[in-house]
């Protein structure tokens, strides 16, 4: 445990920050680069613990990967060139690595056992395992394969036409990766569009894939081709500074080179709806992904309702938006967010418990919470639940509390944003 005590601030936030590379895209760049033929180069790779688990897994399967800071070079072996690992694969805390790799490993001609830390071992895997079994996959583990560790017995896979019962880009991506192995076309249908980095990047690598936002089809592709991936800044990391600059009076912050993929920008839509002074500058397309600079100037805010199709576009930002809601006038209602119960921790519980501890007026509901705003927050102990996004939320909360906030463990921040505290200190004026 590595606690951090944060005193109340007297100033405001001013300056420019370049947030680290997008976690979702960093994971996928390693996966697709490894199963492609030829060289893939990656710039602005997220140097966090989760993404390193993905690199380590492919190194164990014989893929030459060189990492120099945030630059990565992958000498892809192609799907047929991956080798059976000599030991079990440790995915640590990374749900993305686990779920995507289950789809990939299911169709490879060897057996693999995968495991993770205590937190990951509590996260349900049947949402991926069940449809993979419909494709012919053989996956065994605790409680009928619902929890790690899992053993995947490689086999030939059938195609599938599958309606996603959950709003999960990870499940969609796992099935699309499995579809690379199957002889016929695999189709994945979703009611609400989730993040589409897998579809966008597979197209760039030469896969036979089509998508209209709700329906994605993929056919067997003999060989993906290596390419260059420039990873944009992670909007989920930028969200903490967006909220901080909105809340702290007199603040003005610029966030450089942030990914603005429309399946991820729900946070921007919601804070604008609340009355934020936020503008996008220098907008451009890089490697098929929209990026730009975000300028935020503090302003009074009003509560809103966050629900429905907005949820998958901001699922990771709900904790920090809940904090913002405590400082907005009126009531904010969050619903349809039951997916947060199966993240690194039960984030609905973690958010409501911590905000209540700080003096916020929060009523938990089955699929979200009701937050009555314009609340003075006191200090106190803040439980990270060993969840990086909850820990960073606690640090940002200290900017608007009357007394000291003690976050019980900040080591988990290394999963997605190792330099978070230093970056925040750099704009405290």
From Swiss-Prot:
Residues involved in 3-phosphoshikimate binding: 23-24, 28, 168, 170, 316, 343
InterPro entries, alphabetized: Enolpyruvate_Tfrase_dom (IPR001986), Enolpyruvate_Tfrase_sf (IPR036968), EPSP_synthase (IPR006264), EPSP_synthase_CS (IPR023193), RNA3'P_cycl/enolpyr_Trfase_a/b (IPR013792)
Entry keyword set: Amino-acid biosynthesis, Aromatic amino acid biosynthesis, Cytoplasm, Transferase
Cytoplasm keyword on record: yes
GO-annotated biological processes: amino acid biosynthetic process; aromatic amino acid family biosynthetic process; chorismate biosynthetic process
HAMAP family: EPSP_synth (MF_00210)
Name the UniProt record assigns to this protein: 3-phosphoshikimate 1-carboxyvinyltransferase
Gene source species: Oceanobacillus iheyensis (strain DSM 14371 / CIP 107618 / JCM 11309 / KCTC 3954 / HTE831)
